[in-house]
Each structure stands twice: as structure tokens, then as C-alpha cells.
């Protein structure tokens, strides 16, 4: 079965989490050179933080932020921050991105203190609900502003990893997710999007709740792999400069994942990753890629290099590709490959975005920096999307909604 090892490690078939960790002394002074944080925002993001904690990720601080005090209480993290205490009183956002936005703005000074001093920050959240959708773009902006205000020579790299709702979750949630991603793209260097419907295609027998858990596992394993390949001795290391080169200004991104324990396992895993994309795009629409292998102790470097030949062949000679590999004892004979490609186009989710651009025309989806979002603009966007709370009259066409989005530099519905 496809993804047997990943499902097993997620505890879906067998509870084999592989928590053996390398001696912390092996980190040496390297851990002080590059400071990394993973921030989970909202319920989905918090679940990923707990999973990373259980996996024993080394080399990164795990930070949970939420408007829901009860959920936050049960999260396993190194640091926790309750957002918008005076606004939600710890009772959550009620699925309203406007509340999530206000909560993050109200906690701006606390967020700035928490995110200070990091070189690389992963933001993880689910798009389509309240806190993840509304608060995550604010947090991304504060990360960048804090670095500038402190006079740092280089802003931290912000990589956001988000899930996109199942189609069956309804149009309102999907449109909220689109708007959230668009706002997030403004302040993230790269936004990796995992389309939940693709998970169902890849593992069709998964029950819906287990599919959410599987998405958490994919995100957690991806982040863990990148962090530890930077921070720990690996079979083939990826350094921070490699990550920076691929992810800086990368825009929208996809992840593909594959596993194999065949006689040609590394090549087969890469082929599966190139075919099992978590976002509907065509290869060739991106220009940079990061490839990461997680392997058992008996895999040779020759196997990996043969697999990389396939990647170069598929992605093209003009693509900038960085890759690394690390050994995990519990992988056994299995090779897992993850391919992250930046600067991709996905009309289904992202409209007519031009990858790697900093500003966009009126038909694009990202708010130009000169039109920074304000509370009233956020209200207008989400009032237009959600008919239950809209200040606008329900109309037969989308002309009014489209005007709002055009004025802000967003996509048209």
C-alpha cells in the first residue's frame, strides 16, 4: 500500500513513532548559529506542533498560538501564547477570520517578543476557519516588521505551510481559505499548500478524520526533515543558505511525497513524489525545488544520486534544485522522498498569480505592500465571503464582491 511507512509512523496502522533521538551533544555549537522556530496557529497548527513534539524534533523551538485557551492547554509545545485575550476571552474565534485577525493584532507586542531572534520560522495553520486564516498573516507580518525594527541586516525566512479545505466543506470555507492564503503570501517568503482533496486521491480509503491526521503527519515530517537536516549531522546536509536560496521570495509552493521499499526504492520514491503532488499544478511552472530523503541505515549514496538524476530530468535543467538526506533507524528498508517546488501556478486555488513577483496588477491575488490590510478591509473581504455575517445584501452575481477584491489587488471570484 502507498505510504505504509508514513501511515504507520502516524499511528494509523501501528503506533511506531520512532522517538529515538541523537545525542543532544552532537548538536555542539551548530545549534547556536541558526535559530529556528515552528509556530502552529489555530487548532490545525497546534495539532502539528503536538505531533512535532511527540516526534522529538531537534533544533527548533515549538510555539503554539491560539485564541482557544482550552485547546492551547492541551498542546505540547516549548512556548504557548493565547491570542486576543481581551477580545475572545480564551473562547476561540468561532470560525471567523476577522476575529482571528483582531486577536493577533491585539497581541502584536507579545507576538513580537516571542518571534524575536530567529533566522528561520515555519508557520503552520489550516486555512478556512477563524484563527489560522485570520491570525497567521498578521503573525507573518509581525515577524518581518520585528526584524526591521531591530535593525537586523537580514529578515528571517518565513515559510508557511497550510492546508486547503476539502471541496465537500463548502464554498464559504474554501473562499475564506483562498483569501487567507492571499493575505499570507504578502508576508511569507514561501507558502506551501497542501490540498486536502489530494490526500483523499492518494489514500482513498482514509476516513475523513484520519485524513486530517495524515495531513498533520505530512507537515510534521516535512518540517522535521528540513530542520534536522540543517541542524544535525546527516547523510547529505542542507544548509541554511540552500534553504534561503530556494525559499526566499518563492511564493506559492507545492509538496510531493513518495515512499518505496522496492529494489529500486530511491528512484521509485522520487517518481512517486513527483506524481503524488499535494496541489493541482503542472511541473515546469516552478523554477526552484528542495528535495529531501529520509532513509534507513542501509541506503547508499549511489541510490540517492540516481534518484536525483530523475528529479533533474523531470524538472528541467534551468531549475535550481537543492537536496539532502538523513538517516532514521525506524525507516528500515523504506526510502521516503519529499519534493518542495516554489513559484508554482495553481489556477484552481491561486488564480492568476505571477510567481516570484513582489507586487501585482489589479487582477492578481496578493495585496501590494502599499495597500497593507487594515481591520476594515479584512472585515469587507470576509463579509463578502460569508453570507451568515455579511453586511452586504446577497446578490445573484459577484460584481460587488469582485470590485472589492479588485480594489485590494485580490483575485476575482
UniProtKB/Swiss-Prot annotation:
GO terms for molecular function: GTP binding; GTPase activity. InterPro entries: Cell_div_FtsZ, Cell_div_FtsZ_CS, FtsZ/CetZ, FtsZ_C, Tub_FtsZ_C, Tubulin/FtsZ_2-layer-sand-dom, Tubulin/FtsZ_GTPase_sf, Tubulin_FtsZ_GTPase. Keywords: Cell cycle, Cell division, Cytoplasm, GTP-binding, Nucleotide-binding, Septation. The lineage of its organism: Archaea, Methanobacteriati, Methanobacteriota, Thermococci, Thermococcales. Belongs to the FtsZ family. It is found in: Cytoplasm. GO terms for cellular component: cell division site; cytoplasm. GO terms for biological process: FtsZ-dependent cytokinesis; protein polymerization. The keyword Cell cycle applies. Homodimer. Polymerizes to form a dynamic ring structure in a strictly GTP-dependent manner. Interacts directly with several other division proteins. Signal peptide: none annotated. This is Cell division protein FtsZ 2. It comes from Pyrococcus abyssi (strain GE5 / Orsay). PANTHER family: CELL DIVISION PROTEIN FTSZ 2, CELL DIVISION PROTEIN FTSZ-RELATED. Essential cell division protein that forms a contractile ring structure (Z ring) at the future cell division site. The regulation of the ring assembly controls the timing and the location of cell division. One of the functions of the FtsZ ring is to recruit other cell division proteins to the septum to produce a new cell wall between the dividing cells. Binds GTP and shows GTPase activity. GTP binds at residues 130-132, 169, 173, 216. Transmembrane segments: none annotated. The keyword Cell division applies.
Amino acid at each position: 500500500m502507498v505510504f505504509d511507512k508514513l501511515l504507520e509512523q502516524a499511528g494509523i496502522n501501528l503506533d511506531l513513532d520512532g522517538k529515538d533521538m541523537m545525542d543532544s551533544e552532537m548538536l555542539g555549537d551548530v545549534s547556536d548559529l541558526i535559530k529556528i522556530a515552528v509556530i502552529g496557529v489555530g487548532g490545525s497548527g497546534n495539532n502539528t506542533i503536538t505531533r512535532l513534539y511527540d516526534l522529538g524534533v531537534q533544533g527548533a523551538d515549538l510555539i503554539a498560538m491560539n485564541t482557544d485557551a482550552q485547546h492551547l492547554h492541551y498542546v505540547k509545545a516549548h512556548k504557548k501564547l493565547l491570542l486576543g485575550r481581551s477580545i475572545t476571552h480564551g473562547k476561540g474565534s468561532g470560525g471567523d477570520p476577522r476575529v482571528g485577525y483582531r486577536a493577533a493584532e491585539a497581541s502584536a507586542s507579545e507576538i513580537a517578543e516571542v518571534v524575536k531572534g530567529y533566522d528561520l520560522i515555519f508557520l503552520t495553520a489550516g486555512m478556512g476557519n477563524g484563527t489560522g486564516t485570520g491570525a497567521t498573516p498578521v503573525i507573518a507580518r509581525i515577524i518581518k516588521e520585528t526584524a526591521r525594527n531591530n535593525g537586523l541586516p537580514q529578515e528571517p525566512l518565513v515559510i508557511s505551510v497550510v492546508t486547503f479545505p476539502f471541496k465537500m466543506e463548502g464554498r464559504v470555507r474554501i473562499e475564506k481559505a483562498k483569501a487567507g492564503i492571499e493575505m499570507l503570501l504578502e508576508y511569507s517568503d514561501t507558502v506551501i499548500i497542501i490540498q486536502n482533496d489530494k490526500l483523499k486521491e492518494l489514500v482513498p480509503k482514509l476516513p475523513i478524520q484520519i485524513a486530517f491526521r495524515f495531513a498533520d503527519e505530512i507537515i510534521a515530517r516535512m518540517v522535521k526533515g528540513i530542520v534536522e537536516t540543517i541542524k544535525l549531522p546527516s547523510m547529505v546536509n542542507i544548509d541554511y543558505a540552500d534553504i534561503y536560496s530556494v525559499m526566499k521570495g518563492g511564493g506559492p509552493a507545492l509538496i510531493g511525497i513518495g515512499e518505496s521499499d522496492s529494489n529500486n526504492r530511491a528512484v521509485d520514491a522520487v517518481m512517486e513524489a513527483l506524481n503524488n503532488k499535494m496541489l493541482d499544478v503542472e511541473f515546469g511552472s516552478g523554477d526552484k525545488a528542495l528535495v529531501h530523503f529520509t532513509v534507513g541505515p542501509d541506503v547508499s549514496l549511489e541510490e540517492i544520486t540516481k534518484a536525483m538524476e530523475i528529479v533533474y530530468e523531470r524538472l528541467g535543467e534551468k531549475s535550481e534544485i537543492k537536496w539532502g538526506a538523513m538517516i532514521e533507524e525506524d525507516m528500515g528498508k523504506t526510502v521516503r522522498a519529499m519534493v518542495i517546488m516554489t513559484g508554482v501556478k495553481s489556477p484552481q486555488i491561486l488564480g492568476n498569480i505571477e510567481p516570484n513577483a513582489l507586487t501585482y496588477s489589479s487582477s492578481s491575488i496578493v495585496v501590494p505592500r502599499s495597500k497593507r490590510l487594515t481591520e476594515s478591509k479584512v472585515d469587507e473581504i470576509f463579509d463578502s465571503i460569508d453570507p451568515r455575517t455579511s453586511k452586504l445584501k446577497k446578490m445573484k452575481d459577484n460584481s460587488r464582491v469582485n470590485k472589492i477584491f479588485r480594489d485590494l489587488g485580490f483575485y476575482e471570484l
